[in-house]
Structure formats: structure tokens, C-alpha cells
């Protein structure tokens, strides 16, 4: 923030959650103006992110292991649909010791349009051999929730950086505080 003198860092970063690199670039120019040194900023933040990823690892959401373990034990098909490139997602899941829980991983490069469009979730369902109507999806971002809803899945929101606004409350089948609560909810409805 200091080096780039960002006008509204929090607002800008929140607006970028769950979007593609292209949409992030558009958002940053909208917040910071056309002279913003986007490529330099992206390189600096990417280097810092990878440094943290290598030295500290990425945090695993509360209840992730419990939910994924229960899903596998229950015989559920488990997929992941991310705007991030699949090779990055696979690397991160491997480092976190979670890769073995996923039957299908769909990265941003595998869908014609990214979130908030439904394409990425429709592709994941197709690869899993299931209908969207029979699937539950868990999201923490606004664009992810819009994507889940548009694809016809049962959208569950577990807020992280973004608190659920009125739109998210209307899109979500349910809003839960963590993934342990998601597991408990699914035990009752699935």
C-alpha cells in the first residue's frame, strides 16, 4: 500500500475477489485511474504471495478437512471450481494436503467465462457427471455466489473477507459461519 499509495486498498481488493486477472486489471484501473502501474503492482504482489506460500503455506479454512473427509466417507463426488488456473490450485491443494479429496478440479482456463458467469460450475458438474440441480456449492465471494446461483446449484455461503449483503442473502440457500457447519447442514439435507 505504501509504495503504490492506493486510494482505497480494501475496497479495491474486495472488488477483485473471485474475478479473473482481466477483471482485476479493469477494477484496479477503475479504482486507481488509467496511470496505475498495474503490471508492476501485479508482479510485486505475486512475488510476495508466492514468498508467503513457500515459507508459511496458505491457511486452510476452519473445518475444511472435516468436511472433505466426511464427503469422501459418504461417497460424494467432490469438485472444485476456481477462477485461478488449475495448475496453481493443484499445487496449493497438494501443499495443504487436501488434493486427495477432489475428484474434479476446474480452473479458470477451462471455462469460456469466469465467475460471476455460470460456466465454471457448469463445467465442473459436466466433468463430475452430475446435474447442477443435484449439487451443492460453497462460496465465500460475491462473484462465486452469483456464479453458483446462475448455474443452478444449491448455493451455500461461508463468508470470509466479504460479509453477506442483501443480494447474497437472497442468492444463498443458507449462510453458515464455517465449513464444520456446512458439513452438519449437508448431513441433514443430503
Descriptions of predicted regions:
Residues 7-8, 28-66, 74:
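Metal-dependent phosphoesterase signature
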Residues 79-80, 157:
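Hydrophobic beta-strand core positions in alpha/beta domains
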Residues 16-20, 44, 59-63, 84, ...:
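Short beta->alpha linker loops
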Residues 69-70, 85-190:
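Asp-based, Mg2+/Mn2+-dependent phosphohydrolase catalytic module
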Residues 1-14:
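Active-site neighborhood of HAD-like aspartate-dependent phosphohydrolases
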Residues 54-59, 83, 152-155:
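Short, flexible loop segments at the rims of nucleotide/cofactor-binding pockets, characterized by
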Residues 1, 20-35, 92, 124-125:
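Helix-loop "lid/cap" segments that line or gate small-molecule binding pockets
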